[in-house]
């Protein structure tokens, strides 16, 4: 399983340095990579355990227009069927991950 961490700062901008000890604490859950997102009061971090799309599944994952960002710890078992549905609706995929299926599904809603 991957590991995710995050927080919303109560006042002002999030301190990116505050994510480091959180990610260090869960690093054993995701030895294959680490990524962060910090903007305004929001901070998200991800420790990756590569299972699907070993080369292209880095997180956080951003929408094409950069308006949405997601970190995900889980597995969508029917992601291939959902990929086909979303492709038929005109969505294009940059990765082969179930995380991108989640992101594009949220955009589609």
How should each PLM-predicted stretch be described?
Residues 1-107:
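N-terminus-centric sequence/structural signature that marks the extreme N-terminus
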């Amino acid at each position: 399983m991957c590991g995710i961490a995050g927080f919303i700062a109560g006042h002002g901008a999030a301190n990116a340095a505050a994510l480091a000890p959180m990610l260090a604490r869960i690093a054993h859950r995701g030895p294959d990579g680490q990524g962060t997102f910090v903007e305004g009061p929001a901070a998200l971090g991800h420790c990756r355990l590569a299972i699907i799309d070993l080369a292209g599944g880095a997180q956080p994952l951003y929408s094409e227009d950069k308006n949405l960002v997601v970190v995900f710890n889980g597995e969508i078992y029917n992601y291939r069927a959902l990929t086909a549905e979303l492709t038929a609706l005109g969505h294009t995929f940059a990765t082969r991950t179930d995380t991108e299926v989640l992101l594009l599904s949220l955009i589609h809603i």
